[in-house]
Amino acid sequence: MNHLVLGYVGLVIGVIVTKKSMVWRVGQVGSVLLMLPATVLVNMNMTISNVSYMMTSDFVSLGLTVLSIWLLPLMLLASQQHMVSESLIYQRVFVGCQVFLTGALVLAFMASDLLLFYIAFESTLLPTLMLITRWGAQKERYQAGTYFMFFTLVGSLPLLICLIGQYQMVGSLALDLSYEGVFQLSYLVNFWWVGCILAFLVKLPLYGVHLWLPKAHVEAPIAGSMVLAGVLLKLGGYGMMRVSLMWGATAMLSSEVFLALALWGIVVMGGICLRQTDLKSLIAYSSVGHMALVVGGVLTGVAWGYNGAMVLMIAHGLVSSCLFCLANLWYERSSTRNLSGSRGLIMIFPLISLGWFLMSLMNMALPPAINLFGELVAMVALYNWSPYSIVYMSLGAVLTAAYSLYLFGMSQWGNTMKNYKNLYTITSREYLLTTLHLVPAIYLIFYLGLMF
């Protein structure tokens, strides 16, 4: 496990010292070499007994670790086209940021101590901020970076305070210990619980603290959007699962408020998506709705809820990352993300429209998509918590189907604008990029046992 993190450190150094013509090749080849042993871990029986002094891997962290490693070569593949014109130093920094960010994510998912997890959690802030503010497309990227930094830091400070307090009371921050019953006063439990999960709710994000996400997605380059939607949001869900498993029922006393916000967020985000005219903005808001169901699954505190949330996070990471790639594919050719100006793509790029079609179906959790299994399991857990929640979940499912069909129909059907008929064709790099998102999403349909 430690060798995997050291591999990313070596890859960052390799990107810095290699000659200009080899920067992207070193990054891509190195990330693929690190990806190969990670995929072998999927077939291993990783339990909580596989714990070293610093690193661990179990059913909670393994899937997200492999997802992070899988997406790195795809981010480099998606970014290569628009980074060719940059100077050598900026290319090195760009590739180095992505490699460092992936290494920090792997360290966060495999940390066996809450302090190490917090350090890795915060280490993702700077490279993500650099990707947004330096390589964003418009001047609003600075505002997006400010929002992202403000929400992240404000949410993370209570977490640090709570971790310090926990260490003073218990003398340990190990993830494999149970801390249930440590607090004797109920108000201290509520205070600690809210302080701990606030950082994770901001990172997910939960409806109400989600304002940074659409801005960051819209202004970020394709690599930033992919890592945000694919993995960074999952840090919040992973952190909530870890904290909940450590403290058990003791830490669930104040979860009703957040569960209510999550259910309301599913409905509201579905309605907002139907009003969007920007491709990236629509996909970003849909992420908030899907992550709200993850919050609901985790905060129910039952095993089914955890399993559903885990499947949802992995499925959403692949689907949303691919949707952002497809949106960027069109943006690089037309310089627009407006839905009304993106009509008739099926007439221009018929094969890529198949990718749009499959990902739209997965986004709405149509059978037999892996998203369906995650959503059903999470919904069962929420229904057991409160039968009234089925009203919000049903309405959210209808709205999700509506905006997914709206996204596909508005972008693929209709009359193509005349100035878009002579666009350059899809390259093999872009076909490969789309395929590498589709293959694991389809593979997991037939091997659900890997995640249950």
Curated annotation (Swiss-Prot):
TM helices/strands, residue ranges: 4-24, 29-49, 59-79, 88-110, 114-136, 144-164, 182-202, 221-241, 252-272, 282-304, 309-331, 345-365, 390-410, 432-452
Catalytic activity: a ubiquinone + NADH + 5 H(+)(in) = a ubiquinol + NAD(+) + 4 H(+)(out)
InterPro entries to which the protein is assigned, alphabetical: NADH4_N, NADH_UbQ_OxRdtase, ND/Mrp_TM
Subcellular location: Mitochondrion membrane
Record's bilayer topology term: Multi-pass membrane protein
Sample GO molecular function, one term: NADH dehydrogenase (ubiquinone) activity
The entry's keywords: Electron transport, Membrane, Mitochondrion, NAD, Respiratory chain, Translocase, Transmembrane, Transmembrane helix, Transport, Ubiquinone
One cellular-component annotation, GO: mitochondrial membrane
EC number(s) per entry: 7.1.1.2
EC category: translocase
One annotated GO biological process: electron transport coupled proton transport
Listed PANTHER family: NADH-UBIQUINONE OXIDOREDUCTASE CHAIN 4
Family that this chain belongs to: Belongs to the complex I subunit 4 family.
Biological role stated in the UniProt entry: Core subunit of the mitochondrial membrane respiratory chain NADH dehydrogenase (Complex I) that is believed to belong to the minimal assembly required for catalysis. Complex I functions in the transfer of electrons from NADH to the respiratory chain. The immediate electron acceptor for the enzyme is believed to be ubiquinone.
Protein name: NADH-ubiquinone oxidoreductase chain 4
Lineage: Eukaryota, Metazoa, Chordata, Cephalochordata, Leptocardii
